[in-house]
Curated annotation (Swiss-Prot):
One of its GO terms (molecular function) is thymidylate synthase activity. It catalyses: dUMP + (6R)-5,10-methylene-5,6,7,8-tetrahydrofolate = 7,8-dihydrofolate + dTMP. It comes from Rhodopseudomonas palustris (strain ATCC BAA-98 / CGA009). DUMP binds at residues 21, 126-127, 166-169, 177, 207-209. This is Thymidylate synthase. (6R)-5,10-methylene-5,6,7,8-tetrahydrofolate binds at residues 169, 263.
Length: 264
């Protein structure tokens, strides 16, 4: 994906050295946008191998409203382990905000159910949004949301999605985020009777950690390959009805995995 390669090149050439919460240090740029036409293939990075199982199960976990890592562990996914407490809890992170945003009167809002229904009833609405950034809950979260706001847009029978990501770990996190939100767009399009349009990824602080620079340079020596195709079980019509077995990725022929340590 040349869009991702361009981002790596921009950070390596123009990035500012910054200190960060983890103490690792970063090269950072502010404000970057990538666009992916979902009709042109599924935007799964090919310049290194990504684990589809982890991407799919994490998204299904978010959609369940779950905030404990047991489901992930049950399916062999460990990407959230560094932030969980001794009981596996993460506090009111993504799933809680997506599915049960707390209201002042003690109730809750299911943002996912609401946005799917709104797309069906009023596809021209400019309010087709979901946010995970809840200032009242941020201090209770093991990790405040990095990908914090997304908006759907319907035109000419196609559903597009734009994600705003306040903090973007470009080497490790961003490839996951691209695939995850592209998949979410395909899923929402299917259950609302629309075709997939674009995934637009807007980044705030887009950074490479100082211990990922050599890996990024290695990745830039690799030519992107043809994108794979994601097929979804057409029988699923409920956004909460998807299972891992409903997704099939074909034609994924990436370069080998590149190891890098996560900054916690």
């Amino acid at each position: 994906m040349i869009q991702y390669q361009d981002l790596l090149e921009r950070i390596l050439s123009d990035g500012a050295e910054k200190h960060d919460r983890t103490g690792t240090g970063t090269l950072s740029v502010f404000g970057h946008q990538m666009r992916f036409d979902l009709a042109a293939g599924f935007p799964m990075l090919t310049t290194k191998r990504l684990p589809l199982k982890a991407i799919v199960h994490e998204l299904l976990w978010f959609l369940q409203g779950d905030t404990n890592i047991k489901y992930l562990h049950d399916h062999g996914v460990t990407i959230w382990d560094e932030w969980a407490d001794a009981n596996g809890d993460l506090g009111p992170v993504y799933g809680a905000q997506w599915r049960s945003w707390p209201t002042a009167d003690g109730g809750s809002i299911d943002q996912i159910a609401n946005v799917v229904e709104m797309i069906k009833r009023n596809p021209d609405s400019r309010r087709l949004m979901v946010t995970a950034w809840n200032p009242a809950d941020v201090e209770k979260m093991a990790l405040p949301p990095c990908h914090c706001l997304f908006q759907f847009y319907v035109a000419n029978g196609k559903l597009s999605c734009q994600l705003y990501q306040r903090s973007a770990d470009v080497f490790l996190g961003v490839p996951f985020n691209i695939a995850s939100y592209a998949l979410l767009t395909l899923m929402v399009a299917q259950v609302t009777g629309l075709k997939p349009g674009e995934f637009v990824h807007t980044l705030g602080d887009a950074h490479l950690y100082s211990n990922h620079l050599e890996q990024a340079r290695l990745q830039l020596t690799r030519a992107p390959r043809a994108l794979p195709v994601m097929t979804i079980n057409p029988a699923v019509k409920d956004i909460f009805g998807f299972r891992y077995e409903d997704f099939t990725l074909t034609g994924y022929d990436p370069h080998p995995h590149i190891k890098a340590e996560v900054a916690v």
